[in-house]
Amino acid sequence: YRGLNIIYEKRPNLRPPVLRQAVPLYPNYVYNSSQVNRAYSDLMALGYFKSAKIAFGEQPRSADVTDIVSFIGASADSTQTLYTREGYLTCNILCTPTLKQSVKVDLEGSTTSSFYGLKATVGYQNRNIFRGAESFDLSFTAGYEFMKAPDARRKRATEFGVTTGLTFPRFLVPWRTGRFRTVNQPKTKVELSINFQDRPYYARTLSSAGITYMWTNSRYSSFSLRPIDINVVDMTRPVDPEFLGNTSNKYLINSFKTQFIGGLSFGYGYNNQRKNLGGNATNIRFNAETAGNLIDAVEHAFFSPAKGKEQYTIFGIEYSQYFRTDLSVSRKIMLGGATALVGRLYGGVAMAYGNSSSVPFDRQFYCGGSNGMRGWTPLGQGSVANPHNDFPVQTGDVKLEANLELRFPVWGMIHGATFFDLGNIWYIRHYSGESEDTVFRFDRFYKQLGFNTGLGLRFDIKFAVLRLDWGIQLHNPNNPSGERWIHNFKWKNTALNFGVGYPF
């Protein structure tokens, strides 16, 4: 097929055009090592092969074998001159498929002085559902939290969600994709999800749909563009008046409204971690998203707000308008053997404007849990504790966090870690009903940082890393001034977190 002689062990499992797109090597072109490396990367990026080997053998050219000897190298549209001397190469590519279907189970648990929590996700994946290396994913998530507070009116919180996605190994666009020839490993992912949440003070349904384009331009860099990102937050049980009655914070009140979120996002990732997990490595993640701008422009041009309301609506639902961005930079330094020192810096900011007075609750930042400040679940804004202590809702517009972790082998598949976490969240502006201390200020934020240490165990069971972290608070900015440094050990100042995979 277009210069490829494809041999299958049994029945054809991948359509020839898919393999042709992944192998930029053509007959009668000069050998090019970068194209060979790209062929290997593109084959593995399909997600269908467990391994791929590219082997070359010399084959002298003779007049009667011109049509069966293949040159390896430049792409079909290359202007390179044909190699006309002896020393021709034959190329054999041996690909071993991985399991077509798989099931994955993720567990995450935590316990603090306030509640116990357990979350489980069961995922199914078909890596070649239409014989074109299309990947179909389906996952089910269930979560349960039990409040320890004896005076809590409702002690349970539950969550159930379904997510499905279909990933194509090419760009799905309504025009010819020839202009994207310089783009490596193009993919398109279509996603749908729905999530039901029943909390002590409210219940809601989260629905989302989106299309994401993903690609790379080098060995370590990856990009994603999500031009369509639609989310609907439906408050199926309005927020309990008792819950809102304790606050006059309009930011919190507006965060729990039925909302329509329509926007776009962009992401960049850099990771030079080697596949065998050896050696030093740097990981960078940057994300930016905005919502409501196009809708807002159309609404202002042709419509007016509904009578008696200040906000514009779409389909009868107020739409959100905001900007959000975050950056994570981590570095792993090997100290010898399997011992490593890993550090991370994280910062994020979100700001509502236009049709919104607050960022949607699910786009706000939180601080605490198994992947952040492991001494808390969660940590509050600035230096002020949230008054709703039997089910704390503690999120903000600004987040700063730093983590340092020493990882070392213990015995066999068991590894240990000692860690330090530093960080907190704040509001970007002052909201009525909240203390001025909850607002981020450069002249005082460093005094409001939470600080914890802790110990962890990691169980490397080949296909996953199970993690158990015990965080111990050292500086709690939620405590009154003069009592923030914790000198006496108390169980209520600790948190036990269970997770799958490394935190960063």
What are these regions (language model features)?
Residues 459-464, 490-504:
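Outer-membrane beta-barrel "beta-signal"
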Residues 126-128, 168, 194-196, 213-215, ...:
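Residue-level signature of outer-membrane beta-barrel architecture
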Residues 103-105, 134-140, 186-192, 207-209, ...:
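Transmembrane beta-strands of outer-membrane beta-barrel proteins
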Residues 49, 98-100, 129-131, 159, ...:
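Outer-membrane beta-barrel channels and translocator barrels
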Residues 1-108, 327, 348:
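Periplasmic polypeptide-binding modules associated with outer-membrane biogenesis and secretion
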Residues 22-23, 101-111, 120-122, 133-151, ...:
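Transmembrane beta-strand segments that form the barrel wall of outer-membrane beta-barrel proteins
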